[in-house]
Amino acid sequence: MKKLMILLAVCSFGLANAQHLGTEYRLKKVVEVPGRQGIAADKDFFYVSDTRGLYKFDHNWNLVQKRVQTKDKNGKFIDPLFNNPDPAKGGANHFGDIDVFDGKIYTGNEYFNLGRGVNISVDIYDAKTLQYVESIPWRPESGQVEVSGVAVDRERNLVWLSDWVDSRYVYAYSLETKQYYTKVQCRPEPYWCQGIFIVDGTMLLAADDGESTYHIADNVYKMDITGAPFTGLVQGTEPVKDTPWSVKTDKDGKVVKRTGEIAGGAMGGRVELFREMTDFRRAGEIEGLCIDPVTDDLLVLNNRGTQIILGMSQGPFKNEGYTKEIHEVYIYEKVK
């Protein structure tokens, strides 16, 4: 009987600390944070990513730990932060949205400049120390050209990646094998997807599809990803891309093709509007999102106050009194 009671207590604790998606949320609180990219939560801490930084807060939003890329006056790294901080040698300069699971922080890393990403990888950090642990290598054969967000599918032991440049697909890798698993087509496309999160078999997608210049709100969408099958990479032939939306041609105007490993297939997903973010203090650039496993609150990070061109801040809206970009986490309580 004693063992049964302990087992029931453990199960109850697990259920109490598992995220569940609601259908209606109400703004409860706004917290200014030092990072502009991503937000994640476990039962003890909140985690915020900046382009070149990681921050950890307790559940009262007191900063308890941080790691920021720093250099000395000669440009030598004091703390490189990234496993490989040299873009010239295949390194990264950019964190996107993040997730935390089983004591590890999952980050999407790349070298990002004016709307294009290269040198992509999923780099995993220890949530206790904020130190690098290992990487999951990117497979460009999947078709992915940028990584804006990372989300762990806790039920299927997968990690999913979003693509800001070409948001038609989201891509999955196995946490067990560290290999490419499958991709899902987002229909209709939530363009400029900045962050994702998975709960109850549903993917939430934060899309920077508004327009800060015109005060048009960004949106959060949802998509059922249950049943996405393994497709992997297979041997095949496909056109060579010139850009994500065009193909290369030879001197005779014929499409250039390549033979080798290509994506073995995909599942079609159905994207629905989950929430229009009209209650942001100002339309800006939506970023990462997550659900607090303790409270079931929805947390969404938004940047405001600067004009955004191709995913990069181009200076403040001085005519509105802004002198810098402001990063805020919007906390929404679940109504039902």
Describe the function of each predicted region.
Residues 26-55, 94:
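Beta-strand-rich domains and repeat architectures in extracellular enzymes and scaffolds
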Residues 20-28, 64-91, 132-146, 183-189, ...:
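Surface-exposed loop and turn segments in beta-propeller and other repeat-based domains
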